[in-house]
């Protein structure tokens, strides 16, 4: 009974397998074209990443400047209080 379950198929089908070589293997001009496309894609991708990083850095600098402005205002307020106290004690 088990010999019928584990039996090999009578023939092997090759219809689902593609037997083709890459065009870049046979034609060197196509290899250069694909590398040019790849380098163009890589340069566009790098430009997008650089732009994102630049925008992120600008946003961080804007936040830091705003924080610095608030700290300076607070420091000015504290200095004015200290000056008033010093004048009142004299």
Swiss-Prot record:
One of its GO terms (biological process) is regulation of mitochondrial ATP synthesis coupled proton transport. Disulfide bonds: none annotated. Gene3D superfamilies: Single helix bin. Residues 42-89 form a coiled coil. It comes from the Eukaryota. The keyword Transit peptide applies. Pfam families: IATP. Keywords: Coiled coil, Mitochondrion, Transit peptide. GO terms for cellular component: mitochondrion; nucleus. The keyword Metal-binding does not apply. It is found in: Mitochondrion. InterPro entries: ATPase_inhibitor_mt. Its main location: mitochondrion. Forms a one-to-one complex with ATPase to inhibit the enzyme activity completely. Belongs to the ATPase inhibitor family. This is Putative ATPase inhibitor, mitochondrial.
